[in-house]
Amino acid sequence: MKGFFYFDLYFSGMSVATSKTFFSAFLKTLGLLWGFILTGLFLDSNLMQQWIAEPQWIANSVMFIGFFLCFKNVTLRIKEQMITAVIIAVLGEYLFSIALGMYTYRLENVPHYVPPGHALVYVGVLYFTKTAFTKLNRRLLEKIFTIIVLVYAVVFLIFENDIFGFLMTTLTLLVLRKRPRERLFYLSMYLTVAYLEIVGTNFFCWEWPSSAFNVFSFLPSANPPSGISFFYFGLDLGCLWLYKKRHKIAWNRMKNQRMIMLKSS
């Protein structure tokens, strides 16, 4: 776990940044993240309650350890974005879960492992999109991931009457049509969130009501809804917006460098 998503460290003998096969790129970023998600949510699951009366403190402890290992190994820029992600996630979780009742956690609280978990999801997806393999095969991955997203949303619509999730998926894909530079990042985020939600709801860590926000009966929802990553995008955009505001000069310099590269290509 010491090499969490860090370009300059080596995991299995290869740098994450230079991973040139899908297996290598996935294993060292999303694979590691998905495995950590599975482990952490299992520790807060109904299965763990068969052995420990209240296991959530264990899940919290494991998350804080994982967050620390990741945080100390990433760049200063990513450190800042991780802190921002945690702050935005705290506000978002209390707004959507506690205030609006969009979903409900097992103990009707916001578990301490959730906000830092948002930050790890952000970092894991970000580094997957920065690997050598994804850079070389970006368009192919975008097509494959889009097909998977569509199939996933349609299956939930047909078999779970997930109109709310399908609507969120449709909005996501429409937004991504005009954001080609971020498309692979958000498609990867969609799939990661779908995995996270399936694991979390099947472990009874949280649940979603049968309609959107448990209010809009004309928007039936599955548990979980398929396209809920649409709301995760607010976290990512918030991190990016705050970073740009704090580092205007560096951000403008990076934009100018991109324009030069595009003109010369």
Please provide the spans of the model-predicted regions:
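N-terminal leader/targeting segments
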Residues: 1-6
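Aromatic-rich, lipid-facing transmembrane alpha helices and their immediate juxtamembrane interface loops
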Residues: 7-265
